[in-house]
Curated annotation (Swiss-Prot):
Belongs to the FliS family. GO terms for biological process: bacterial-type flagellum assembly; bacterial-type flagellum-dependent cell motility. Keywords: Bacterial flagellum biogenesis, Chaperone, Cytoplasm. Gene3D superfamilies: Flagellar protein FliS. This is Flagellar secretion chaperone FliS. NCBIfam families: fliS. CDD domains: FliS. It comes from Escherichia coli (strain K12). It comes from the Bacteria. The keyword Chaperone applies. GO terms for cellular component: cytosol.
Length: 136
């Protein structure tokens, strides 16, 4: 029992240290990794009929999408990509809420595929510094 709590404490410190020293681009990458991890876990919990695990994982994914990825976008922007991402994130949240209510693994997998495409595009853009704009 004590060892598990100690391990969790060290893991939490490691995450906090990584966040504190990360660039904005690395933070967004961490958000993508976190939401994808939560979605994979939600699918597995749904397949195992683990309602509590499913709920916790879907809540985490929704929280990251709404309070991490979506709020980092400028909703007042007229940029088409920004507006499309805002709409897509809203769609993903709706699908995850439906997945939770209906125990619909395919909805979680749909959101995971969409998110993986966005995450892959983001990570690819990091390899081309000319594609990354500095925040204003």
């Amino acid at each position: 029992m004590y060892a598990a709590k100690g391990t969790q404490a060290y893991a939490q410190i490691g995450v906090e240290s990584a966040v504190m020293s990360a660039s904005q681009q690395q933070l967004v990458t961490m958000l993508f990794d976190g939401v994808l991890s939560a979605l994979v876990r939600a699918s597995l919990f749904m397949q195992d009929n683990n309602q509590q695990g499913k709920g916790v994982s879907l809540s985490k994914a929704i929280n990251i999408i709404e309070n991490g990825l979506r709020v980092s976008l400028d909703e007042e922007s007229k940029d088409e990509l920004t507006q499309n991402l805002i709409a897509l994130y809203s769609y993903m949240v709706r699908r995850l809420l439906q997945a939770n209510l209906r125990n619909d693994v395919s909805a979680v997998e749909e959101v995971e595929a969409l998110m993986r495409n966005i995450a892959d595009a983001w990570k690819e853009s990091l390899l081309s510094p000319s594609l990354i704009q500095d925040p204003v």
